[in-house]
Amino acid sequence: MNLFDFFRGRQKQTSASVAKERLQIIVAHERGQRSEPDYLPALQKELLEVIRKYVNIGSDDVHIELENQGSCSILELNITLPDR
């Protein structure tokens, strides 16, 4: 490094390296946000089919949430039942 390099500062990054870095940040963020297991939509569909055998409900009436608390996972199932 000579004296002129010091005054010029760092070299600019290429647009490809900047884009790659941004993409890596986005992918890491998306992976961190993804807490829903792959089987959850299939589980919701099957539960809806079983419940429909006994009660007339729509697909929007069943809500499933999976919450992770430390080493425990909590599966919460909320069903909105129609008035009789």
From Swiss-Prot:
Gene: minE
InterPro entries named among the record's database cross-references: MinE, MinE_sf
Name of this chain's protein: Cell division topological specificity factor
Family statement: Belongs to the MinE family.
Keywords: Cell cycle, Cell division
A single GO BP: regulation of division septum assembly
Any Pfam family hit: MinE
Lineage of producing organism: Bacteria, Pseudomonadati, Pseudomonadota, Gammaproteobacteria, Pseudomonadales
HAMAP family: MinE (MF_00262)
